[in-house]
Every structure is written in C-alpha cells, then in structure tokens.
Amino acid sequence: AMTGLKTIVLSMPIKQKSAQHDLSLAHQEWLKKNFSNVEGHTLELDSLFKSFEGTLNNFGNEHGMANSRARLRMTTLYQVAAANSGIVVGTGNKVEDFGVGFYTKYGDGGVDISPIADCNKTEVWELGKELGILKEIIEAPPTDGLWDDGRTDEGQLGLSYKELEEAMENENSINREKYNSIRRTNLHKMEPIPVCKIPN
C-alpha cells in the first residue's frame, strides 16, 4: 500500500471463525483509511467451497480439504489480479517460507512477489508496530484459518515462532531436531519439482 500503486485487499472467508473474519475486516478498513490507493472487497467463498466438497464427496480427506481452502483463495487472488492487470503479493515470512515450509503448496505459497519473505515472524511483528498496524492484529495468535476448529499455527507445529526462529539459527538449540523434523516433512514445497531426466 505504501508504494502508492493501486492495491486490492481481499477477505475471502471459507467456513471462517467470526473472530478471524472480524480481524481481516478490521485490517482491511485500517488499510483503506490510511492509504487512498487501497480498495477492499469481501468475497464469500463458502457456497463455492461447499459445492467443491459435495462434488468430491467420495474423495473426502480433512487435510486435503483444508489445503483446498488455501488453493481456492489462491485461484481467486489470481482472477482478481488478472482482471486488474496486477500481481499477487505474498505474505509469507522467512521461517514459514524457507524454514519449516508452513504453507499450502499451490495455495498461499502461490504468489508473484514475496516482499517480507526475508523477515522472521518476530521482525514482521516489530514492523507492524512501527507501521501502526492494529494491536489486535499483531497480538492475535497466528493461524492459517484452514480448519473448522480454529487451531493455531503453534498448535499445529508444536513450537512457537520464536522457538522456531531460534532453532533455525542455532544448531545447538534444544528445539533443533523438532525444527529439522518439520522442515524435512515440508521440504518438497521448498525445492524444485523433481524432473525425470531422459538420457540422450
């Protein structure tokens, strides 16, 4: 938004907890209030996702459906970007994107640029404070918002972001093996797609 370029921010609720959606809308309003180049939209994707679930009823899988929420949002972002001759801007940070790979492949990982991907999560929080982002946004427990039970990132990962950052940077960390275990599981997201090399 600070670039002065036209910026479109979207809230795309899919079976969303009301508290999560309220925070999304509050941040959208804050951006519109502070930057005249920002426009915000709420695109309700519930009915579309329900239709998707119904179509794939014989192939139900909770984890797969959770990731499908992120992929539906990614598809929506690219459609809105295409309609505006724009690009999709990512929100992933260093520990998520390059440390433990805590994102959905072809979901929230599907972006054109990633301006804060070299910042740790704790640095993103500090940056948010510096910019005057709403306190309730900064202090909200991080969550991917993909699960009906509203589980947090820490609940899924088993470590806080501060612990993950420390383990990422310190080979002697007591959490290093846990960090490495999560990283190994998700490494396929962070590496190039395997290609079968055909001999000449």
Predicted regions and their residues:
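A generic local structural motif
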Residues: 74-76
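Conserved SAM-binding loop
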Residues: 24
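Conserved Walker A/P-loop ATP-binding site and its immediately adjacent core
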Residues: 20
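Conserved SAM-binding loop of SAM-dependent methyltransferases across substrates and taxa
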Residues: 1-3
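ATP/NTP-dependent adenylation/nucleotidyl-transfer catalytic domains that generate, transfer
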Residues: 5-8, 15-16, 27, 31, ...
